[in-house]
Amino acid sequence: MMAGLSEVYKGLWAGDIEPGNAKISRGENYLGLPWVILDYPRIFGREDVLAIRTMFWWGHAFSITLHLKGKYQQIYLPVIVARRAGLAAAGFHIGIGDDEWRHELVAENYAPLDAVDAIGAGRPFLKLSAAVGLDRWVEAPQLLGELFDLLAGMSTH
């Protein structure tokens, strides 16, 4: 499924920023359960990060996360603020945890986007994440594509 999503995502990416190559990773133990991740776009630098990470976490859900840091956080923050209502309506949550590598959508890591006062205020990174439940397995590729399109659309302002 992730390989298929990778091709869909490549067709949807229209940003000015070169997205890098898609990467699919898998493992057996994210908090005790197997996982698969697709990163596209995928720009991971020491100071600057731009990634849209789609994760399947066995027994939990699919999630799609926009991960920004450094110059990409500065570039995208005004667009996120301007499109906040639409992102919230699509089910996106904002990262509030201190560990940028925690992906599970739980209260210690994420809050509803419309429940926070200031987006990205004083934080070293910014993450927006939405989930697609396993009860929507058949629809998941389409729904993840729509969520990706919403995030990727911000790259064209």
Locations of regions flagged by a protein language model:
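Charge-rich, low-complexity N-terminal segments
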Residues: 1-44
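Soluble extramembrane domains of integral membrane proteins
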Residues: 20, 28, 34-36, 49-50, ...
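Long, solvent-exposed, polar/charged low-complexity segments
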Residues: 1-10, 107-157
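A structural detector for beta-sheet-dominated domains
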Residues: 41, 95-97, 131
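Aromatic- and glycine-enriched beta-alpha-beta binding-site module
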Residues: 31-86
